[in-house]
Swiss-Prot record:
There is a cross-link at K35 (Glycyl lysine isopeptide (Lys-Gly) (interchain with G-Cter in SUMO1)). Its main location: cytoplasm. The gene is RPL4. Residues 31-50, 81-101 have a biased composition (Basic and acidic residues). The modification N6-acetyllysine is found at K8, K28, K35. Residues 31-101 are annotated as: Disordered. The keyword Phosphoprotein applies. Keywords: Acetylation, Citrullination, Cytoplasm, Isopeptide bond, Phosphoprotein, Ribonucleoprotein, Ribosomal protein, Ubl conjugation. GO terms for cellular component: cytoplasm; ribonucleoprotein complex; ribosome. It comes from Sus scrofa (Pig). The lineage of its organism: Eukaryota, Metazoa, Chordata, Craniata, Vertebrata. The modification Phosphoserine is found at S36. This is Large ribosomal subunit protein uL4. Component of the large ribosomal subunit. The ribosome is a large ribonucleoprotein complex responsible for the synthesis of proteins in the cell. Residues 51-71 have a biased composition (Basic residues).
C-alpha cells in the first residue's frame, strides 16, 4: 500500500481552514452583537424568552422556510458543475488511444 504523501498536509490544512472559518464566524457574530447593542434593539431578548415558553412550532416553520431556498440554491449549483464536467470528460480521446495501441 502506498500512503498518500499529502495526507498529513491535507489534514493540517483542513484543521487550519476550519479554525479560520470559525474565527471569521465568531467575529461576524461579535459584530452583530455590537451593532444590536448600539441600536438598543431589545428584539433578541424577548425571542429568547419565547423560545423557552412558547412558539416552538413557529421556530420550526421559520427554520424550514430558511432551509428551502438554500436547498434550491444548492441544486442549481450542483447542476452547473455537472454540465461542465460532461464536455471535459474527453471519452473519444481514450478510445483513440486504445485504437492506436
Amino acid at each position: 500500500l502506498k500512503l498518500n504523501p499529502y495526507a498529513k498536509t491535507m489534514r493540517r490544512n483542513t484543521i487550519l481552514r476550519q479554525x479560520r472559518x470559525h474565527k471569521i464566524r465568531m467575529d461576524k457574530a461579535a459584530a452583530l452583537k455590537a451593532k444590536s447593542g448600539e441600536k438598543g434593539v431589545p428584539d433578541k431578548k424577548p425571542v429568547v424568552e419565547k423560545k423557552g415558553k412558547k412558539a416552538i412550532g413557529k421556530k420550526a416553520v421559520g427554520v424550514k422556510k430558511q432551509k428551502k431556498p438554500l436547498v434550491g440554491k444548492k441544486a442549481v449549483v450542483t447542476k452547473k458543475p455537472a454540465a461542465e464536467k460532461k464536455p471535459a470528460x474527453k471519452k473519444p480521446t481514450t478510445e483513440e488511444k486504445k485504437a492506436v495501441a
